[in-house]
């Protein structure tokens, strides 16, 4: 029997942002409604995709997404092995906006957890998502699909690590208190940086960000003082003019590394001409990101090989699952037939008689099941149908 899984969804590849916003499912209200509409299913809803996975016909899932203002051209529908293959590609990071990004694996895990909490899973979906999560872990541990920085903030951290190796003894100055500064500090804190100095035009914003990451806050007038204390400067402030020029960096005993990720730039390019200063800008970081993306692309065939192996493993499990269903039905049928044939027999005799009756059928099912998965109707399906009519 063909695998009865289905997937209905939309993603950054098929729908613009405003459509994805309409389709996104809030976990408190909209997600339970979606699972209720599906009966049994798992919903994966992120900023870049909303996908409904279930067993049987995809029509209810399709109707649910259309009811949220999605038009048919934005949807994709996959069934059987193709639905499972898509789930595996998603969990491995191959279908992400940035190939190999790690966040999606946690989102797949969360989707399964929420479906379980609603009582919306069943055996095929459980196995599909459990195997997808295991595959995602293998893809990241056995290939380089998740290696290297592919965001500007992480590329800046990679550059700092390449220069210093250990960040624990460093004083790092961050210019700006916006989203990019926050993202960089998140990465920085995870690597155990020694001292964080946050400088911003509005000192209150600097204080709020510094408190989050255990740093010190300064207003813009204190920038010259901060520069004298820093080993590394990362600039991401919104400013219409340069905040740091050659005149702000008098000669010093140890070199100063500066990474300018602001646009417009915060640091005068002439700073890079100073013998004691090493300046990197967005173009330098973009080259790092592009190189890492090319390296990840080279790992895709390895991940696809893992996916095909996982598909084979799942289909082998599914063959056994179908046989187990048929065996249970056969055993129940055999007990009924034995009781009809020997109404005076006791429980032990009836169980033995039922076993003798069912045994040859069970052996035949086990021999033929694996050869039939995904092809024409299996012997066990015919038996299940016939037994349901007796």
UniProtKB/Swiss-Prot annotation:
GO MF annotation terms: glutamyl-tRNA reductase activity; NADP binding
Chain positions recorded as substrate binding sites: 46-49, 96, 101-103, 107
Protein origin, superkingdom: Bacteria
Catalytic activity: (S)-4-amino-5-oxopentanoate + tRNA(Glu) + NADP(+) = L-glutamyl-tRNA(Glu) + NADPH + H(+)
Keyword entries, A-Z: NADP, Oxidoreductase, Porphyrin biosynthesis
E.C. numbers: 1.2.1.70
GO biological process: one example: protoporphyrinogen IX biosynthetic process from glutamate
Pathway assignment: Porphyrin-containing compound metabolism; protoporphyrin-IX biosynthesis; 5-aminolevulinate from L-glutamyl-tRNA(Glu): step 1/2
Active site residues according to the UniProt entry: 47
UniProt-annotated binding residues for NADP(+): 176-181
Record site feature (Important for activity), residues: 86
Subunit structure: Homodimer.
Domain notes: Possesses an unusual extended V-shaped dimeric structure with each monomer consisting of three distinct domains arranged along a curved 'spinal' alpha-helix. The N-terminal catalytic domain specifically recognizes the glutamate moiety of the substrate. The second domain is the NADPH-binding domain, and the third C-terminal domain is responsible for dimerization.
Function: Catalyzes the NADPH-dependent reduction of glutamyl-tRNA(Glu) to glutamate 1-semialdehyde (GSA).
Protein's name according to its UniProt entry: Glutamyl-tRNA reductase
Lineage of producing organism: Bacteria, Thermotogati, Deinococcota, Deinococci, Thermales
């Amino acid at each position: 029997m063909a695998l009865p899984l289905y997937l209905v969804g939309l993603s950054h590849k098929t729908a613009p942002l405003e459509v994805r916003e309409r389709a996104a499912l809030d976990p408190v209200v909209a997600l339970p409604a979606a699972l209720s509409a599906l009966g049994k299913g798992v919903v994966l809803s992120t900023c870049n995709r909303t996908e409904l996975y279930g067993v049987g016909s995809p029509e209810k899932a399709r109707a649910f997404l259309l009811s949220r203002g999605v038009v048919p051209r934005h949807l994709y529908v996959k069934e059987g092995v193709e639905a499972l293959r898509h789930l595996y590609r998603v969990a491995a990071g191959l279908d992400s906006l940035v190939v190999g990004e790690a966040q999606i694996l946690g989102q797949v895990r969360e989707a399964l957890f929420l479906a379980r909490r609603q009582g919306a899973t069943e055996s095929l979906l459980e196995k599909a998502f459990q195997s997808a999560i295991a595959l995602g872990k293998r893809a990241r541990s056995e290939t380089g699909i998740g290696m290297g920085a592919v965001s500007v903030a992480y590329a800046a951290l990679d550059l700092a690590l390449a220069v210093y190796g250990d960040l624990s003894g460093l004083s790092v100055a961050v210019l700006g208190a916006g989203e990019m500064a926050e993202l960089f500090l998140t990465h920085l804190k995870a690597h155990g940086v020694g001292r964080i100095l946050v400088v911003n035009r509005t000192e209150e914003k600097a204080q709020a960000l510094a408190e989050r990451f255990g740093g010190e806050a300064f207003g813009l007038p204190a920038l010259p003082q901060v520069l004298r204390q820093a080993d590394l400067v990362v600039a991401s402030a919104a400013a219409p003019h340069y905040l740091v020029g050659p005149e702000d960096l008098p000669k010093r005993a140890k070199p100063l590394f500066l990474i300018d990720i602001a646009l417009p730039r915060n640091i005068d390019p002439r700073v890079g001409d100073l013998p004691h200063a090493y300046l990197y800008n967005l173009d330098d970081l973009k080259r790092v990101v592009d190189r890492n993306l090319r390296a990840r692309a080279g790992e895709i065939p390895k991940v696809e090989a893992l996916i095909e192996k996982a598909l084979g493993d799942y289909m082998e499990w599914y063959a056994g699952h179908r046989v187990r269903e048929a065996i249970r039905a056969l055993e129940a049928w055999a007990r009924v037939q034995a009781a009809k044939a020997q109404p005076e027999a006791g429980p032990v005799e009836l169980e033995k008689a039922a076993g003798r009756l069912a045994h040859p059928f069970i052996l035949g099912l086990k021999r033929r099941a694996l050869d039939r998965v995904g092809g024409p109707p299996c012997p066990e399906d015919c038996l299940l149908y016939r037994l349901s009519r007796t």
